[in-house]
């Protein structure tokens, strides 16, 4: 596969942008080689500047649940752009999208729109501290909640991809109130609550971990966290930036039937444009300015382009048949990949929930960050490039989730599984 144009573009970019990219994982450091520079996308496909076509399972890291350039979304964005792209004043579109979010996500009674998942998570933590009048938070090793300072402790996503323990420039004072526990370990969480009695404002978790690879919560784990938060007077925050409108229309909280106090949303909620949100119980959200005294603001928060994209997207995926279809696609992919790996004698695990899925080159169960890091990342890199050469675009890191869209047809899924069979055979030795 020719990638001369991408190579030249990457060389140019490295002189202008740190590492040649604007988000670290895009640089292919986790798999080696030259990142593909994209020209355009359509449906389930990406097209790079060399003219290569790829079946895309990254989907802009999750937002594009309808696929690339979905006609109704594009039409809505273009129509709104002609009316104005940003006003810095309220619009009815914000209320319209808020109504859709509140109707979909079981625990959310009020919502505030922001422009990124990082903003949503940092605002939710500030709100939890304001509401409880406590300072400490509990997060989980390998879970990623954006790049705000309090979260860059044992973080996943690009931090894990690059093998960084934490980040320089983050002061000890910024993380001194951040406590960490292993994912899927209730006893460790309870020990933290006991050791910090009356001091923990909130526990924040990705209910399905998508930033240390794809790791599911064990049965009863989320319910156990809910019980511990109630017992020790802390708020439970679900970071559903990735899982919201992905594992189910109502997110992971609907999928597992466990209700948090606050929820962070992003990716799908903006229909492919920069938008995110945090929301929860009315009594808590009423503390947010100007209704209350917990300050948070943003120039482009609730901008009309993102609002119309989100409105169209949520209306489309609210149709009952959508998630039935998406769940079938991820099931077929996981089963097909596992069978192909087993046939070639390669230790392999694949997991899915709704329209999210992921896999590890590992023989033992992957249930937390420590076990995820034992997976064979070198083997993953070989597999990634073998798939890329066959026109299948996966996340360029073992420590990221994969996604499907409504544009992924049965034919494309079969083509992907055939490519995986060839890839496993090629890396077997």
From Swiss-Prot:
<protein>
    <recommendedName>
        <fullName>Glutamate-1-semialdehyde 2,1-aminomutase</fullName>
        <ecNumber>5.4.3.8</ecNumber>
    </recommendedName>
</protein>
<dbReference type="InterPro" id="IPR004639">
    <property type="entry name" value="4pyrrol_synth_GluAld_NH2Trfase"/>
</dbReference>
<dbReference type="GO" id="GO:0008483">
    <property type="term" value="F:transaminase activity"/>
</dbReference>
<dbReference type="Pfam" id="PF00202">
    <property type="entry name" value="Aminotran_3"/>
</dbReference>
<dbReference type="GO" id="GO:0005737">
    <property type="term" value="C:cytoplasm"/>
</dbReference>
<feature type="modified residue" description="N6-(pyridoxal phosphate)lysine">
    <location>
        <position position="267"/>
    </location>
</feature>
<keyword id="KW-0963">Cytoplasm</keyword>
<dbReference type="GO" id="GO:0006782">
    <property type="term" value="P:protoporphyrinogen IX biosynthetic process"/>
</dbReference>
<keyword id="KW-0663">Pyridoxal phosphate</keyword>
<dbReference type="InterPro" id="IPR005814">
    <property type="entry name" value="Aminotrans_3"/>
</dbReference>
<dbReference type="GO" id="GO:0030170">
    <property type="term" value="F:pyridoxal phosphate binding"/>
</dbReference>
<keyword id="KW-0627">Porphyrin biosynthesis</keyword>
<dbReference type="InterPro" id="IPR015424">
    <property type="entry name" value="PyrdxlP-dep_Trfase"/>
</dbReference>
<comment type="subunit">
    <text>Homodimer.</text>
</comment>
<dbReference type="InterPro" id="IPR015422">
    <property type="entry name" value="PyrdxlP-dep_Trfase_small"/>
</dbReference>
<dbReference type="InterPro" id="IPR015421">
    <property type="entry name" value="PyrdxlP-dep_Trfase_major"/>
</dbReference>
<comment type="pathway">
    <text>Porphyrin-containing compound metabolism; protoporphyrin-IX biosynthesis; 5-aminolevulinate from L-glutamyl-tRNA(Glu): step 2/2.</text>
</comment>
<dbReference type="InterPro" id="IPR049704">
    <property type="entry name" value="Aminotrans_3_PPA_site"/>
</dbReference>
<keyword id="KW-0413">Isomerase</keyword>
<dbReference type="GO" id="GO:0042286">
    <property type="term" value="F:glutamate-1-semialdehyde 2,1-aminomutase activity"/>
</dbReference>
<comment type="similarity">
    <text>Belongs to the class-III pyridoxal-phosphate-dependent aminotransferase family. HemL subfamily.</text>
</comment>
């Amino acid at each position: 596969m020719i990638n001369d144009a991408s190579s030249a573009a990457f060389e140019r970019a490295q002189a202008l942008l740190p590492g040649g990219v604007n988000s670290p994982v895009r640089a292919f450091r986790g798999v080696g080689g030259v990142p593909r520079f994209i020209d355009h996308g359509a449906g389930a496909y990406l097209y790079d500047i060399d003219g290569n076509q790829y079946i895309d399972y990254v989907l802009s890291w999750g937002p594009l649940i309808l696929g690339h350039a979905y006609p109704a979304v594009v039409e809505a964005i273009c129509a709104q752009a002609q009316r104005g792209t940003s006003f810095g004043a309220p619009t009815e579109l914000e209320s319209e999208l808020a109504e859709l979010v509140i109707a979909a996500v079981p625990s959310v009674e009020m919502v505030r729109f922001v422009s990124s998942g990082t903003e949503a998570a940092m605002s939710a933590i500030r709100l939890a501290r304001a509401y409880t009048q406590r300072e400490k938070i509990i997060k989980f090793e390998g879970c990623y909640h954006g790049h705000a300072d309090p979260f860059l402790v044992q973080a996943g996503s690009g931090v894990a991809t690059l093998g960084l323990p934490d980040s320089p420039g983050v002061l000890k004072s910024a993380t001194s109130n951040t406590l960490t526990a292993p994912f899927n370990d209730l006893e460790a969480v309870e020990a933290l609550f006991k050791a910090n009695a009356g001091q923990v404002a909130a526990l924040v978790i990705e209910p399905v971990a998508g930033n240390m690879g794809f790791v599911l919560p064990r049965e009863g784990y989320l319910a156990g966290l809910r019980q511990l938060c109630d017992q020790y007077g802390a708020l439970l925050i679900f970071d559903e930036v990735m899982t919201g409108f992905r594992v189910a229309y109502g997110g992971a909280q609907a999928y597992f039937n466990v209700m948090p106090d606050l929820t962070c949303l992003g990716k799908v909620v903006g229909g492919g444009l920069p938008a995110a949100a945090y929301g929860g119980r009315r009594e808590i959200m009423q503390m947010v300015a100007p209704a209350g005294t917990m300050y948070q603001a943003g120039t482009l928060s609730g901008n009309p382009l993102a609002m119309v994209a989100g409105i169209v997207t949520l209306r489309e995926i609210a149709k009952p048949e959508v998630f039935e279809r998406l769940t079938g696609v991820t099931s077929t992919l996981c089963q097909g990949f596992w069978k192909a790996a087993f046939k070639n004698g390669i230790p392999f695990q694949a997991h899915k929930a709704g329209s999210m899925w992921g896999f590890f080159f590992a023989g033992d169960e992957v249930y937390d960050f420590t076990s995820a890091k034992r997976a064979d990342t070198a083997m993953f890199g070989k597999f990634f490039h073998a798939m890329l050469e066959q026109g299948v675009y996966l996340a360029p890191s073992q420590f990221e989730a994969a996604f499907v869209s409504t544009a992924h047809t049965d034919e494309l899924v079969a083509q992907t599984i055939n490519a995986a069979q060839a890839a496993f055979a090629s890396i077997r030795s």
